[in-house]
Amino acid sequence: MAHPCATDPELWFGYPDDDGSDGAAKARAYERSATQARIQCLRRCPLLQQRRCAQHAVEHRVEYGVWAGIKLPGGQYRKREQLAAAHDVLRRIAGGEINSRQLPDNAALLARNEGLEVTPVPGVVVHLPIAQVGPQPAA
């Protein structure tokens, strides 16, 4: 099974910069993408994979994207404190101190579902007759 970020990397690591819209529209589009990525990460990625992603983001000083359910704010100077705080959380996730699903923001995001369409999993229910015990009449 591929991790969700491997199937649609633009959702996790891209920035909608080529659509010709203004800055506010781009920021809204980026926020929507990041929210969808966080929900998918938190729901579909195993905890071990989230820890690996967090470790990678910390080791490589990543500034953008969604890693282990944490949205990084970017590399702008004015966001350096937010980035440092996010890296601290990622360090703790990577070290196994915390579970990203249990962080207050992530738990709330999962609880309210944020409009993400969940693909239903088809299921089949088969009803079998109860086996008769004892001698069977000859046909």
Swiss-Prot record:
Cofactor(s) it depends on: [4Fe-4S] cluster
GO BP term (any one): regulation of DNA-templated transcription
The record, for InterPro entries, names:
4FE4S_WBL, Whib
Q: Where is the 4Fe-4S Wbl-type domain?
A: 4-77
Q: Which domain of life is it from?
A: Bacteria
How the cofactor binds, per note? Binds 1 [4Fe-4S] cluster per subunit. Contains 1 [2Fe-2S] cluster after reconstitution of overexpressed protein from E.coli. Following nitrosylation of the [4Fe-4S] cluster binds 1 [4Fe-8(NO)] cluster per subunit.
Q: Per UniProt, which keywords does this protein have?
A: 4Fe-4S, Activator, Cytoplasm, Disulfide bond, DNA-binding, Iron, Iron-sulfur, Metal-binding, Transcription, Transcription regulation, Virulence
The listed locations are:
Cytoplasm
UniProt keyword Transcription, yes or no = yes
Q: Which residues bind [4Fe-4S] cluster?
A: C5, C41, C45, C53
Induction of this protein: by what? Maximal expression during progressive infection is between 2-4 weeks, however low, stable expression during chronic infection.
Q: What happens when the gene is disrupted?
A: Not essential in culture. Gives an attenuated infection during both progressive and chronic mouse infections. Mice infected with the disrupted strain induce a stronger host immune response than wild-type. Growth inhibited by S-nitrosoglutathione (GSNO), a source of glutathione and nitric oxide. Mutant cells are less metabolically active. When chronic infection was reactivated by corticosterone the mutant strain was not able to resume growth, suggesting that WhiB5 might be involved with bacillary proliferation during reactivation.
* A molecular function (GO) term: 4 iron, 4 sulfur cluster binding
Instruction: State the post-translational modifications.
Output: The Fe-S cluster can be nitrosylated by nitric oxide (NO).
Q: Name one Pfam family in it.
A: Whib
What GO terms fall under cellular component here? cytoplasm; peptidoglycan-based cell wall
The protein's job, in short, is: A transcription factor that is probably redox-responsive. Probably plays a role in immunomodulation and reactivation after chronic infection. Its induction results in transcription of a number of genes including sigM, and the genes for 2 type VII secretion systems ESX-2 and ESX-4. Seems to negatively regulate its own expression. The apo-form has been shown to act as a protein disulfide reductase. The apo- but not holo-form probably binds DNA.
Give the family, as the similarity comment puts it: Belongs to the WhiB family.
Can you say what this protein is called? Transcriptional regulator WhiB5
What organism is this sequence from? Mycobacterium tuberculosis (strain ATCC 25618 / H37Rv)
